[in-house]
Amino acid sequence: MQRIEAMTLADAVFPRIQTDSRYLAWARDAALMLGFAGFVAVCAQIAVRLPWTTVPVTGQTFAVLVTGGALGMWRGAGSLSIYMLMGMIGIPVLAPGAPDVTGTWGLHFILPWNGTNAFPWDISSGGYVVGFILAAALVGYLAERQWDRKPWVHLGMFMGNALLYVPGILWLAYLIGTDWVPAGASKPLGEYISGSGTWNKALEGGLYPFIVGDLMKLFLASLTLPAAWGLVARFKGKQPPDVTPQTPAD
């Protein structure tokens, strides 16, 4: 049986065989996507509540970047889509809400499980949940081109991290501009965030508080994937595979 050359870390750890049936390959990919969706859910429960924003700092960003890098573009995006759908159908996989991280400052570390569930358009952090899908797709696309084992892996992680902020900040700005009142709150979202003007508040509540933490998380993700490739190479006794397409010999 001949193995198909690895394109991503997941393919190197769980290699496909050329004799695998289509259904076996689908089952393998589905299991990987579900498993990494669970990984993101666990990391979402590592949450820090800041007093000046309704969006918590969580371990999700790290998990999203690693998921994209490990699975590749389509499976990475699929895994984060599953994660979003799990929250939409009532499974508490999203980050803890404000009532679960009490006080002006708060920390929650996985247990007891205080995850939430919601449609993305019902929560202030919904734009970021959508952004996770885009970020995983971009990082996965780059990983399929070996960026996850190159010196510029940090750049790819930064690009993915930056991309997830686009829908996140846009959605937050929309909610602030429409005087949206969060569930269980007594005043509009914008009044919980310092600053003046819709866009200034959106940046104050949805970007500035997370810059340092996200730089740390993307740096950690940048170390995790090359290290994982190194372990694979060590246990399999070879270098991380070069996935440059080869033309079959006649």
State where each predicted segment sits:
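Short, charged juxtamembrane terminal tails flanking transmembrane helices
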Residues: 1-3, 237-250
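Short helix-perturbing small/polar motifs within transmembrane alpha-helices
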Residues: 2-22, 28, 40-42, 99-169, ...
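Hydrophobic transmembrane alpha-helices
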Residues: 2-81, 85, 89
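Peri-membrane helix termini and adjoining interfacial loops of integral membrane proteins
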Residues: 3-10, 95-109, 178-199
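Hydrophobic alpha-helical transmembrane segments
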Residues: 30-34, 62-66, 77-81, 125-130, ...
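Transmembrane alpha-helical segments of multi-pass membrane transport proteins and ion-pumping complexes
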Residues: 37-45, 69, 73, 80, ...
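Membrane-embedded alpha-helical hairpins and interfacial helices in multi-pass inner-membrane proteins
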Residues: 53-54, 143-242
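Pore-lining transmembrane helices
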Residues: 60-62, 71, 75-76, 96-97, ...
